[in-house]
Structures are given as C-alpha cells and as structure tokens.
C-alpha cells in the first residue's frame, strides 16, 4: 500500500502552535498517535486528531489497509492566508491584529 493522505485547509490556528502537536506524532504508530492527541491539552490536538482519523478512514476504506499496521509516515503544517484585522487604540491610532491560519496534512502508511 502507498501513502494515504488527509488534509485540512485553512484551520484557524497558527502554524507555530499546530507544529508543536504534529511534531509529537510524526513516525509513531496510529494507535500511539491517537493516544497522544487524546490526552494533549492543546486546541491543536483536537484538530490534528480529526485529520489523523480521516487519514485512517481513507486508508481503511480506499486501500483496504489494516489499521493495526498503520504508522504516521508524514505529518506537516503549512501557513495559510493570514486575516488582517484592526484594533482601535487611543488617540485615533489603530493596531493590526493578525488572525493566522494553517494547512495540516497527515499521511499514513504501513
């Protein structure tokens, strides 16, 4: 079986914060990765877990893979478009607020 991919585009989460979670599961078995994500207190863990579960479902449904043999072969986070917003400040000034997004990609293989 080749690699099976699942990705989430435009997640409303900074790439820096998502990478902290993704780095923990790269190269691990699928069951171990799900365990790590389940007990992680970070917001990114919930999002990455959904992407990983999607990759597992894709492998099982499309390739007929055995879930017990799957490993997280590749996992990476790319920056998405940043939304620029304005926060009014004193004396007519304004500060810029950057609402960052990211693209999360997880590939599983046996």
Curated annotation (Swiss-Prot):
The keyword Repeat does not apply. Belongs to the universal ribosomal protein uL22 family. Keywords: Ribonucleoprotein, Ribosomal protein, RNA-binding, rRNA-binding. CDD domains: Ribosomal_L22. Part of the 50S ribosomal subunit. It holds the Pfam family Ribosomal_L22. InterPro entries: Ribosomal_uL22 (IPR001063), Ribosomal_uL22_bac/chlpt-type (IPR005727), Ribosomal_uL22_bac/org-type (IPR047867), Ribosomal_uL22_CS (IPR018260), Ribosomal_uL22_sf (IPR036394). One of its GO terms (cellular component) is cytosolic large ribosomal subunit. GO terms for biological process: translation. This is Large ribosomal subunit protein uL22. It comes from Marinomonas sp. (strain MWYL1). It comes from the Bacteria. NCBIfam families: rplV_bact (TIGR01044). This protein binds specifically to 23S rRNA; its binding is stimulated by other ribosomal proteins, e.g. L4, L17, and L20. It is important during the early stages of 50S assembly. It makes multiple contacts with different domains of the 23S rRNA in the assembled 50S subunit and ribosome. One of its GO terms (molecular function) is rRNA binding.
């Amino acid at each position: 079986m080749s690699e099976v991919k699942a990705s989430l585009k435009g997640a409303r989460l900074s790439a820096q914060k998502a990478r902290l979670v993704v780095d923990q599961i790269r190269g691990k078995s699928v069951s171990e990765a799900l365990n790590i994500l389940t007990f992680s207190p970070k917001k990114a863990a919930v999002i990455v877990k959904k992407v990983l579960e999607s990759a597992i479902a894709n492998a099982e449904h499309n390739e007929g893979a055995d879930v017990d043999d799957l490993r997280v072969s590749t996992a990476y986070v790319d920056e998405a478009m940043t939304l620029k917003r304005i926060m009014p400040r004193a004396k007519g000034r304004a500060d810029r607020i950057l609402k960052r997004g990211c693209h999360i990609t997880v590939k599983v293989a046996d």
